[in-house]
Regions:
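Short secondary-structure junction motifs
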Residues: 42-45, 127-132, 158
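N-terminal amphipathic, basic helical "cap/leader" segment at the start of enzyme domains
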Residues: 1-88, 191-194
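C-terminal helix-cap and adjacent tail motif
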Residues: 3-13, 18, 158-194
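Short, flexible, mixed-charge acidic loops at enzyme active sites
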Residues: 88-97
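A glycine-rich helix N-cap at a beta->alpha junction
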Residues: 67-79, 149-173
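Small-aliphatic-rich amphipathic alpha-helix that forms the alpha element of a beta-alpha
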Residues: 33-34, 77, 97-148
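Acidic, glycine-rich active-site loops and adjacent beta-strand->loop/helix elements
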Residues: 53, 83, 138-142, 165-167
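Solvent-exposed alpha-helices and their adjacent loops that cap or buttress functional pockets
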Residues: 39-42, 69-71, 126-127, 149-153, ...
Length: 194
């Protein structure tokens, strides 16, 4: 698929068929996630891929509102941001900081880079002929997810992505694009100055 088609077709899919997702597609999706930008090549992301019983276990742990529409997707990816990878990397001699201070980071790139990896997951799913939806994990559910899947303490989940074959065409009923339009280009993009 052409890149512009992938960008144009990407949307949050909220209903999935029971058709399985091939291992090859999952591996391509995850390989592309690893190709995202990484400040200082810190590579401070990790991903937990869940299928079958593990996926059901995840859904049983989180609040029902969190992933109701995503429960039927056969694949779930939980992306994690690893702040320490960035703090350690930028304390190395070639980066010029002598400490691991967070004050050097007015924008926490561990979240930015992990978010870019999520976008690559969403776009690759489209390229594979699949649908996907990103959703948050409630703060009250993070510890249960961490314990159930042996997630290291320094790995922070930034949400989850459900992946599968979309059960419907177009925008899902109740989805935000049905209630509000995309902001006009000229209202959002400013050339030279505001």
């Amino acid at each position: 698929m052409e890149f512009q088609d992938v960008v144009r077709r990407r949307r949050m899919v909220r209903a999935f068929t029971d058709e399985p997702v091939s291992d090859e597609s999952v591996r391509r999706i995850m390989r592309n996630a690893l190709r995202g930008p990484s400040a200082g090549f810190s590579q401070g992301q990790a991903f937990l891929v869940l299928r079958g019983e593990e996926k059901e276990r995840f859904h049983d742990l989180v609040r029902p509102w969190t992933a109701r529409s995503a429960r039927t997707a056969p694949v779930l990816v939980v992306p994690f941001a690893v702040k320490d990878a960035y703090l350690d990397r930028y304390a190395q001699p070639d980066k010029g900081w002598t400490d691991r201070g967070e004050e050097h980071w007015p924008v926490p790139f561990w979240y930015v880079d992990t978010g870019m990896a999520v976008l690559l997951i969403l776009q690759t799913a489209v390229d594979e002929g699949l649908g996907a939806v990103y959703f948050g994990i409630g703060a009250e559910d993070v510890d249960a997810v961490r314990e159930a899947f042996g997630v290291p303490a320094d790995h922070e989940p930034i949400g989850a992505v459900a992946i599968g074959h979309g059960a419907e065409e177009g925008v899902s009923p109740g989805a935000s694009p049905n209630t509000r339009g995309r902001r006009p280009f000229d209202e959002v993009v400013h050339f030279g100055r505001w």
